[in-house]
Every structure is written in C-alpha cells, then in structure tokens.
Amino acid sequence: MSDQDKFIQMVLSSGPQFQKLLQVIGRESGLSEDLRIVFQKLESSTLPVSDLVVKNIFESERANYDWVSYELKPLGVGTMAQVHRAKVRMNGKIKSVVVRFLKPGIEKRVYEDKRILSEIAPILDSNHVYLASGLPKLTPLVEDLSKTIIAELDLKATVDRQNMGYRVYRGSKTVDLGGYKNILKIQVPQVYWPTTPTKLMVQDMVFGKKLEKVSQQYESVLPKMKKAVAELVAEVWIEEVLFKSGFFHSDLHQGNFMVEFREDETKVNLIDFGMGGQISSTTQGAALALGVAVELLKPETITESLWDLSEQAHNLLLKTQFRALVDAKVLNIKHGLESGVKVEDWVAWAIQKGIKFPFIFISLNRGFGIINNMLKEAGSSHTLATISKKVGLKYALNIAKDLVDNESVTAKELVKLGLGIKKVPARCENIFMK
C-alpha cells in the first residue's frame, strides 16, 4: 500500500469533523497537483452504510412515504449523509425522487469528535514549537468547524434553507458557450416534507452531471460552457446575498450543482443546502463598509466595521486594543511589510486576534472564498470583484446612499475610489479585490 493510500485510509477511519476539515482544505486554491488528487480521492472514497441499514431506514418511513421502489445502492455518499434514488406515490401519481438521510450514529461521532478536538486544540496552541511555526491558532478554527458540522445535523434547517433557495435562486440568461448560444437556467429541486416526524429529506429527482464532466464531454464544441455556468451561478449568488434577501448557500463548489445540457436550454440544479443562511440588512451594510475601508486602508472604519460585525460581549480584547492592532497592520501594509489583504483575510486575522464573529458571518465569509475558488477552477477571468461590479450596476443609487449616510466613508473618498454615482457598483470590486 502506497503512502498516499495509507493516508486516505487513516482519514477515512477518523471522525467526521477531521474529514470535513480536510475537504475544506482540498477545495482551497494553491494546492499542489499531488495534494489535489489526494483530496479528490478522499472525497470519492467515503464509505456508505450497509444495504441492510438502508432497507431498514426506508421501511421505517412507510407511514410518511408510499414507496413504489427504492435503490439500495447510493447515488452519492458524503461524510455525514448519503442519497438514494427512489419512486414514491404522491396524490395518486408516481414521482422519481432523491432521498437523503444522515448516517445512523453520526450525531454521536460528531459530538465525540468535537470533544477530542476541543481538548487537543488548546494544547497545540500553547506548544512552543507550534507557536514558532506561525500557523494560526486551532481553538477558534475548531469552534467554527464544530458549529458548521453540528448545523448539518439539523435536517429541518437544511430543508428550510433549500425551500428558501427554491424560491430565490432563479435565473436564466442567454450565453455564448463557444460559437453556440444557449439558455442557462438556475433552479433548485423542490423538497417534500411530511407533517409527521421524519429522518428523510425527499426531493425532486434532478438530472445532470458535475460541471467538470459536462464541460469535458462537450469541450470540443462548447469550449466556454464551464466558465459561463460558473459565472451565472456567481451572479445569482452575489446578487441575492448582497442586494436582495441576504440569503446564501455557503458551500457552492462545483460538486454542489448538477448540469443538464440540452440543445435549447441547459439546467443548472443547485443542491446540498447543509450550509448557508441569511444575513440582515445591517450585516449587509457593515460588510460593504468593511470592503471599502479595506481598499482605502482606513483603520478607523476597518475597526468599526469588524467590531460591528462581531459578538462584542465575547471579544477577548478591548476595542481600543483592537484599534491599535489594526493601525499597526495598516501601517505594515503601507510600508510594504505585508501584502494587501482581502476582506476574508482581515476577518481571519481578526479571529486570530480574539474577535468573535457570529456563526452566520463566518459561514458567509466561507461562501465568499468558495465562490471565488469556483470561478478560478472554471477558468473564468472573473472574480467576485468583477461579478459584483456587474451585478451592482442595478443598485448604484442605493449603494451610494448607504455608504455615505452611514458615515462609513465620505463622498470625497468614494470619488477617490472612482465610486461616483455612475460608478458606485465598483465598490463591490473593492470588497473582493485580490
């Protein structure tokens, strides 16, 4: 057995939180090709539960669902859940559906994993060798990861998020796929939730393949398909979270949307709403102010925005102390001692310094990175910066009013950034500038 295979077996024998952590790392940019291949193998090597367990799960739900048939072989297997094809009778009609359930016993493993990692993290954080390595503190990372994993245990919350996605993630656009025009249509499968308690999530069967496979299949005749799909998904996502309801899917990597190509219309089905949420208009405004402040390297507004976004009562330092740290960091950037950083980097840095952000904002921050990485993997020349600028053209007046009225920046500073009324949406570019 090769060292690579040994590593994979070791990870598969570990707890769900550690596996999830490695999956997140595997989706980050900057990994070597060897590591990328290892993480891809890990994601495709997750073991399913036995056929007998699957059968018992389906049969125990007959009071909720009138099964016509179901497949014991899983359609897909994840760290915590798996999905199966089935047919169910509803209102006298037979529907093809996909059934998702959490693996039996996974909740116990999640909390056991949390206990172990929570004990190990502070020990490593205080180890002089680890401290000298310059690596980030593990304790806040473990806390955030635990919240993410535990949130996925709430099946009803996942259903609620998918129902929200079903309502708001709608968009279609005629695009050039490379010498061929086609309509791209974004949609989310409908969920069927019974009135009595259930452990299953039953949703419409959607067809299609992962974007990578579809784009490879049609690469010779539709060379721009991969980029076009990724860019439309990013447009719909960023418009909803920044300019509309504030709702977001925080894990929209390429594995979480299925593409069904047809000559007249290509359907892009967004799936797996285990992670996500909805931010308030106040959070939207604070995030926008932070983005502009980061671009201006304006320490007072960076401090105010990060502090406003945080759980202030739980921060481990005073606001004056945090302001001093921000001042020093800005000075280092201006003197070339540190490279310029994005909003996501400022948030990660603040966490390491003891700022406590609500889980919803951390989840959103992760979503920013996932979308940016998705665009990069698709070979798009766009980033969230340029996508946001394009989408923001519809909201120019509101953007200008919010930023100036909240005294986050002055009108003169907006002009300095090229953010006159006609150009205000460019502020989105400043938020996600790389």
Describe the predicted segments one by one.
Residues 1-249, 254, 258-285, 290-434:
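Broad phosphate/nucleotide-binding scaffolds in NTP-utilizing and phosphate-metabolizing enzymes
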